[in-house]
Amino acid sequence: MEHLKTLILGSGPAGYTAAIYAGRAGFAPVIYEGLQPGGQLTQTTEIENFPGYPEGVEGNQLMEDLRKQAERFGAEVRNKVCVKADLSKRPFTLKFDDESEVLTDTLI
């Protein structure tokens, strides 16, 4: 069974931001995208209140930029959905929609 240092569930802005910081700190983050890769912002036409985009930005573009930045710092992105998590003991055990299981020391 694969054993990860840091696993992040969800690929919205919070997931990618966590991956950027975890990657910069050397924690080798792996992001599992979930049901909607890029999160709900991929459904948003224009975002006008996000720092660094004075003219606004499309939701898809923002999420693409966040993904690139997370990958730049070592994040790996996987397209799977978590269906079960055992958080009763460490390392945590997560099961995914393809029947695979993963151990992780840190879960975000």
Describe each model-derived feature in a short phrase.
Residues T42-E101:
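N-terminal Rossmann-like dinucleotide/flavin-binding domain of flavoprotein oxidoreductases
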Residues V30-Y32, R78, I108:
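Hydrophobic/aromatic beta-strand patches that form the interior of the parallel beta-sheet core
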Residues G15, G38, G56:
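Flexible, glycine-rich phosphate/dinucleotide-binding loops
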Residues M1-A14:
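Beta1/beta-strand and adjacent pyrophosphate-binding region of the FAD-binding site
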Residues E2-L4, F96-T106:
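Core beta-strand elements of the Rossmann-like FAD/NAD(P) dinucleotide-binding domain
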Residues L7-L9, G23-Q43:
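Glycine-rich FAD pyrophosphate-binding loop
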